[in-house]
Amino acid sequence: MRVEVGQIVNTHGIKGEIKVKSNSDFTDVRFQPGQVLTVVHNNNDLEYTVKSHRVHKGLHMLTFEGINNINDIEHLKGSSIYQERDHEDIVLEENEFYYSDIIGCTVFDDQETPIGRVINIFETGANDVWVIKGSKEYLIPYIADVVKEVDVENKKIIITPMEGLLD
């Protein structure tokens, strides 16, 4: 299964480095040198092997094998990046999920009232924050006091909102 792991937002410098906004988990594995990524540009799948990876100002800075010039990569700005989800070396702990499994889930409160769908996930250091789009946009911390049940198979999440969380 192929999952979207990011988007090329810009280039950096003149040697073919790109800035990638990640919408994925496990970026330390996904973007490590030697990993193969698929860039979808104009409905064409272009495969690239990661040559280098670093994080700068919240963005992932990547170079690809065989790309040494800004002119070779600049046309890919705005393109989405995908990777096959076949990392047997990533072991999920209890209550740990792939972002791609959470994004798109419908969120309900503990009374089964629908709140919205998960549209994005942010890493904050202490815990992830899920962006829920419903009648408004809500930021829900992924903590045990709030998130009570995650049913990935049925794309359903139950939360107990803290006071003021849905205001």
From Swiss-Prot:
InterPro entries: PRC_barrel-like_sf, PRC_RimM, RimM, RimM_N, RimM_N_sf, Transl_B-barrel_sf. One of its GO terms (molecular function) is ribosome binding. The keyword Oxidoreductase does not apply. Signal peptide: none annotated. Its main location: cytoplasm. It is found in: Cytoplasm. One of its GO terms (biological process) is rRNA processing. Keywords: Chaperone, Cytoplasm, Ribosome biogenesis, rRNA processing. Pfam families: PRC_RimM, RimM. One of its GO terms (cellular component) is cytoplasm. Residues 94-165 form the PRC barrel domain. An accessory protein needed during the final step in the assembly of 30S ribosomal subunit, possibly for assembly of the head region. Essential for efficient processing of 16S rRNA. May be needed both before and after RbfA during the maturation of 16S rRNA. It has affinity for free ribosomal 30S subunits but not for 70S ribosomes. HAMAP family: Ribosome_mat_RimM (MF_00014). The PRC barrel domain binds ribosomal protein uS19. PANTHER family: RIBOSOME MATURATION FACTOR RIMM. Belongs to the RimM family. Binds ribosomal protein uS19. This is Ribosome maturation factor RimM. It comes from Staphylococcus aureus (strain JH9).
